[in-house]
């Protein structure tokens, strides 16, 4: 019965009407615009640094803002900015997200001028992987540009993070979009014509790729009108002075990404298969000890324990630092051979065989059924973290107390059946109440119809035995 319950990362994004300063120490201003401010902040419980976007209510299109929060709360990919919480008070909305310390890609491009192909490759690979994943979830970004790409330094690995999903929306394959979104240099011609699909993102990525390699855009002009006219014309060139040293494969990929007709333009999945990447992609070695630990934890992950799964997901999303996830992130990226942002049965088998020799495909099939919390047949980054994170990092008393208080919505010191149901309401609205009654029965050892902290602690310890 519990197999009916499905949930994704959005179940763990907290919406609060309490004072944000109760949980955060607000620090320096990182950026300021017409609609609000971004400030550095420290989460009091974990001491983690985060970024808080503060938006004045009177200047917001609330429908658009809530759509951005909804989209970010659904996306679980190492190269997409992570959102933690959403606050509201009388004057402002607050979006709490991860803090990226390396600055904008735009600043790096301005400072550096041009990138060698070997330097551009990891940037493009991460960008296209993020967009391939978002397109796979029927989400189009619509405003890809270097100013919306952050660099985050985690250990020795610079990571690209796609930000500003305010112009993003859900799309369907049989329905074109018409609202003009984007920035003149990077906008696709079909967006200007107001009939377009998700391939507009591929055009924008093609422009970014072009600029990385030569330092100027393919469609230039002295004014926005001139730039847009040149985009509409769609003609671009590879002047010998800058492009003579650039490989034919790079030029071929740019041509395919900047194909004028969207129906003939390459898809994100096809971009990732282009031979240019194989020339310059850095060959990463698997850390065998991390891999072994991850696979052992995956095999032990218990099926049909959705309340425990939700608790683990909440703790990982809200409380485990990026530094503590870094090794597992590298393992996920190593296993994701086609770079589409999810792990398939075949990718798990291949990685497992590299470590242990061989595994029965049926074992992997059952493993995926246990781990695949949203039931889509593949393992996303969030689901991977849920089943591989070290037990000791999850089960600290501080983490369990924080999760318990978050689930105890009315603050009466226990979790009721209605409070359990509220955890799953975003993604499993029509599940029979008997499923939740069984959950309660399994956890409620004293039979009083509610889960106290001691009972909550016990079921979590038991889950990892």
Q: Language-model features: where?
A:
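Protein kinase glycine-rich loop
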Residues: 27-34, 38
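Conserved N-lobe beta3->alphaC-helix segment of eukaryotic protein kinase catalytic domains
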Residues: 49, 54-75
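A short, aromatic-enriched beta-strand patch in the conserved N-lobe beta-sheet
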Residues: 85-86
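Conserved short submotifs of the Hanks-type protein kinase catalytic core
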Residues: 91-104
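Activation segment signature within eukaryotic-like protein kinase domains
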Residues: 123-124
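Amphipathic regulatory helices of Ca2+-sensor modules
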Residues: 312-313, 344-357, 380-391, 416-428, ...
